[in-house]
């Protein structure tokens, strides 16, 4: 969260106050959770304004929406203003917290009732392309196209035990696809970019770093994730420039 806070505030940790996901208070020796508070997940320990906050303060009528797989990422991008949404770890739907809104909008609630996110999850993670396309060779859980699970190159049953739908979203490319899919809905439902007033959409693809941490940067899983992400981003950006007024959108990718 430290680097994300630096990106969204333009400040160093000594200024924005984020030094980790949790730490010890050096006065009381109490454990401090970055986004934990009485109103649910919120930017209680983020002390510098985010870009979203600055936009809302200086541009009346502007809208700012933040979307991520994890609550911490969505909160750090949104800061103290705007809309923030993340995946519910229990049912794998989309949620917010009372800090931002009493409840999610009806279009989000409807998607949750229909369990739409489950459509992104597949029984097993298979490579997008044939084996010869991949430069990396180490694979743990992914199944190469044209092979079955029992023919997997690596022995054993894989490194991760993805038992919950939330884990399957967080540690497979499905998480990125779901986030970008929800971001497209947010653009349409909140009418982002629909007029001359600038709006802001912040998206964090948490599954990317989760997969990299779990399997290693030289794994087939990471390579396949980026192939899929490239395709997902192409689809998302095509939607953005078609949806936004006069195609007038600025994209920052980091």
Where are these regions (language model features)?
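Acidic helix-start/capping segments at beta-turn-to-alpha-helix junctions
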Residues: 1-5, 72, 252-254
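Short, solvent-exposed loop/turn segments at the edges of secondary structure
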Residues: 1-2, 196, 246
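Stable alpha-helical elements in mature extracytoplasmic
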Residues: 3-4, 47-51, 60, 179, ...
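Conserved beta strand-loop-helix elements of the APE1-like EEP
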Residues: 6-12
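His/Asp/Glu-rich, glycine-adjacent segments
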Residues: 12-197, 206-213
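Alpha-helix capping and helix-loop boundary segments enriched in small/acidic/polar residues
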Residues: 42, 170, 174, 213-227, ...
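Structural motif
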Residues: 200-204, 252
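Metal-dependent active-site segment of extracytoplasmic phospho-/sulfohydrolases and closely related
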Residues: 228-254
């Amino acid at each position: 969260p430290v680097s994300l806070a630096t990106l969204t505030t333009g400040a160093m940790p000594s200024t924005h106050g984020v030094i980790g996901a949790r730490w010890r208070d050096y006065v009381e020796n109490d454990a401090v959770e970055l986004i934990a508070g009485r109103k649910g997940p919120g930017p209680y320990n983020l002390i510098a304004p985010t870009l979203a906050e600055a936009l809302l303060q200086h541009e009346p009528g502007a809208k700012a929406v933040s979307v991520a797989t994890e609550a911490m990422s969505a909160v750090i991008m949104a800061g103290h203003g705007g809309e923030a949404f993340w995946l519910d770890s229990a049912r794998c739907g989309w949620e917010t917290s009372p800090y931002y809104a009493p409840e999610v909008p009806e279009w989000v609630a409807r998607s949750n009732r229909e369990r739409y996110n489950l459509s992104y999850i597949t029984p097993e993670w298979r490579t997008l392309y044939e084996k010869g396309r991949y430069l990396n060779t180490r694979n743990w859980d992914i199944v190469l196209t044209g092979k079955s699970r029992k023919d997997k190159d690596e022995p054993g049953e894989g490194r991760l035990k993805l038992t919950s739908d939330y884990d399957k979203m967080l540690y497979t490319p499905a998480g990125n696809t779901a986030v970008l899919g929800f971001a497209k809905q947010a653009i349409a439902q909140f009418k982002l970019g629909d007029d001359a007033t600038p709006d802001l959409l912040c998206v964090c693809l948490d599954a990317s770093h989760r997969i990299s941490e779990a399997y290693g940067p030289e794994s087939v899983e990471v390579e396949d994730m980026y192939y899929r992400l490239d395709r997902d981003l192409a689809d998302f950006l095509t939607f953005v420039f078609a949806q936004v007024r006069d195609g007038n959108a600025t994209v920052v990718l980091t």
